[in-house]
Amino acid sequence: MGDITRFGISIDSDLLDSFDRLITRKGYQNRSEAIRDLIRATIVEEKMDAGHEEMVGTVTMVYNHHVRDLADKLTEHQHQHHHQVISALHVHLDAHNCLEVLVLKGSSAEIKQIADELLGVKGVKHGKLFLTSATPEHH
């Protein structure tokens, strides 16, 4: 972590009031922490858009395990990308549905491609990809 630098910003009072309500609702101790988090989030987003930065992500999906060969297809996809898939969690939600959460590491482009492939497999009811930086910025 580098030296702390103080700086001032000019902001519309209505926007500041909205921001203050937001940071109170989210439990921030002060504006500085909230602004630091916004800056970090923007930097992570830039890395995702670049496509070549190392990222980590989770793919969460729900599927009906009775769909023919679906579990085998999903497992095969994971094995095809064994360098990127670093962990998997499988949960039986009920007699028919399963939740699977995969943790992936690689470039954002690789992770997005793998997620698209998995979520596009026939029988996957729904799912979502969450990406973040594998190299966190300073606190």
From Swiss-Prot:
Which processes are annotated in GO (biological process)? response to nickel cation
Q: Which CDD domains match?
A: RHH_NikR_HicB-like (cd22231)
Q: Which InterPro entries match?
A: Acetolactate_synth/TF_NikR_C, ACT-like_dom_sf, Arc_rbn_hlx_hlx, CopG, CopG/NikR_regulator, Ni_resp_reg_NikR, Ribbon_hlx_hlx, TF_NikR_Ni-bd_C
Q: Which cofactor does it need?
A: Ni(2+)
**Any S-S bridges, and between which cysteines?**
none
List the Pfam families hit by this protein, alphabetically.
NikR_C, RHH_1
What role does this protein play?
Transcriptional regulator.
- Listed name of the protein: Putative nickel-responsive regulator
> What is the source species?
Trichlorobacter lovleyi (strain ATCC BAA-1151 / DSM 17278 / SZ) (Geobacter lovleyi)
Traced from the root, the source organism's taxonomic lineage reads: Bacteria, Pseudomonadati, Thermodesulfobacteriota, Desulfuromonadia, Geobacterales
